[in-house]
Amino acid sequence: MDGKQSEITIREALASESAIILHHRRSMFRDMAEGTVEELDRMVEVAGPWLARAMADGSYHHWLAVDEADHVGGGGGVLLCPWPANPRDPCTQRAVILNVYTEIEFRKRGIARQIMLTILEWIKAQGLRGVNLHASAEGRGLYEKLGFEATNEMRLKF
């Protein structure tokens, strides 16, 4: 990219663009120093077929940030999971935001915020009443500014 900032458009990703989604997922974990090269390669190998199925059945939606030259500068997605209703939320689906990533040369331009606002509007339009995500240290400030709060979630790894 030259020094000029291009106009960014956020658009829904096509299933044929799964390679860029997987590239962003791998880059996200690499940037957080999560996983060895071999583990990241295996993750992409396993995630590819899952992503194709999830995009085909509508359980995963992804958006890309593209500039005027159609360079992809980032993206983010949402996974819709079956979930039992509870007293405060009668919905039987839960939305989980995943894979929010901005390429290094596109950072500090508000692109992650644009992606998140697009995803949040889409989730609201589906009639869902909330959304979860796991925040990296880099993303936590943005998510807090958007109104996300820490919860009482716990995890056990095997």
Model-derived regions, located:
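A short beta-loop-alpha structural element at the N-terminal edge
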Residues: 9-23, 34
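Conserved catalytic-core motifs of GNAT/GCN5-like acyltransferases
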Residues: 82-86, 92, 132-138, 144, ...
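Conserved GNAT acetyl-CoA-binding A-motif
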Residues: 123-135
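Conserved beta-strand in the GNAT
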Residues: 64, 71-80, 96, 101
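Conserved acetyl-CoA pyrophosphate-binding loop and the N-cap/start of the following alpha-helix
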Residues: 106, 110-118
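Conserved GNAT-fold acetyl-CoA-binding loop/helix
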Residues: 29-50
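A short helix-loop-beta-strand connector motif used in the catalytic cores of GNAT acetyltransferases and
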Residues: 49-64, 96
